[in-house]
Amino acid sequence: MANAPKVFIDGEAGTTGLQIRERLVGRTDLQLISIDPDKRKDADARAEMLNSADAVILCLPDDAAKEAVSLVSNPNTVIIDASTAYRTAEGWAYGFAELDSEQRGKIAASKRISNPGCYPTGAIALTRPLVSAGILPAELPVSYNAVSGYTGGGKAMIAQFEDESAADHTRAPYFIYGLSLSHKHVPEMQKHGGLLTRPIFTPAVGRYAQGMIVEMPLHLSTLNGAPSLADIHAALVKHYKGEAFVEVASLDEAKALTTLDPEGLNGTNRLKLFVFGSDAGGQARLVALLDNLGKGASGAAVQNLNIALGLDEAAGL
């Protein structure tokens, strides 16, 4: 334990930070260090913690994350940023290890790792394998429809649903948002999905805490070679073969389902993909199921931490 790498979570009191801490507490292969709560806003104290750690996980808003990065002068400190600030930035490894065969190595070799967004994790997981396989044309306009538990919106949205004194408190069971089609996750989806055309993203929130479904509907006739559902399924299976945290449901399992529960993978770092649709109708409905606070946030951060520090990738997961 004495020689175990030191890990500092900057923003450990937030929703994602708390879940990361829960996954790391008690591990003997690393040392979790914390700042005095009274000094969380003290730049000098934070800088000392950031530079004394072997790895830091930033669970902060974008601007605060950028400030934290600017405080790191130790060239050996690994930074894993959970904000959107660096997800499309040069010099940062994108922290979706299953993106392609080279991504895990890029994460392991990098000192700057950007943790993926929850919605993009599902969208990219469905899209990138099909683009790489030549099935989905990179220039094809695609749409992503998604629903998340309200924790996906951070403290503000949690208060909106749970705090009756909040100015924007709602009793709605479900609502759509991102109506201007300018959600901040779209550039990330496009870049790491391998798309040349900006996708349409239509998110929604339900009155439940966590759990997420991301969908990509497709007309088979718009794809290269007019593939069948089995062809699409085979491409996904091939891409994720051997991956511990990404599962592609069998076509038989998908066919037997009549509904899908967005809370189905809560508390895990798993991501499950489904191929629904109709060959006769020439349409596919691809679906990703995940915990927005698991594989969509804290779980992915711990997975990236393990990779970056050369530890067991599944530790704490």
UniProtKB/Swiss-Prot annotation:
Alphabetized Pfam families for the sequence: Semialdhyde_dh, Semialdhyde_dhC_1
Keyword Transmembrane: no
A Gene Ontology BP annotation from the UniProt entry: L-arginine biosynthetic process
Subcellular location(s) of the protein: Cytoplasm
Top EC class, one word: oxidoreductase
Gene3D superfamilies: Dihydrodipicolinate Reductase, domain 2 (3.30.360.10), NAD(P)-binding Rossmann-like Domain (3.40.50.720)
UniProt keywords, alphabetically: Amino-acid biosynthesis, Arginine biosynthesis, Cytoplasm, NADP, Oxidoreductase
Reactions catalysed according to its record: N-acetyl-L-glutamate 5-semialdehyde + phosphate + NADP(+) = N-acetyl-L-glutamyl 5-phosphate + NADPH + H(+)
Molecular-function GO terms, alphabetical: N-acetyl-gamma-glutamyl-phosphate reductase activity; NAD binding
Keyword Oxidoreductase: yes
One GO CC term on file: cytoplasm
Residues annotated as the enzyme's active site: C118
Pathway note: Amino-acid biosynthesis; L-arginine biosynthesis; N(2)-acetyl-L-ornithine from L-glutamate: step 3/4
Superkingdom of the organism of origin: Bacteria
EC code(s) of this entry: 1.2.1.38
InterPro entries: AGPR_type-2, NAD(P)-bd_dom_sf, NAGSA_dehydrogenase, Semialdehyde_DH_NAD-bd
Family: Belongs to the NAGSA dehydrogenase family. Type 2 subfamily.
Function: Catalyzes the NADPH-dependent reduction of N-acetyl-5-glutamyl phosphate to yield N-acetyl-L-glutamate 5-semialdehyde.
Protein name: N-acetyl-gamma-glutamyl-phosphate reductase
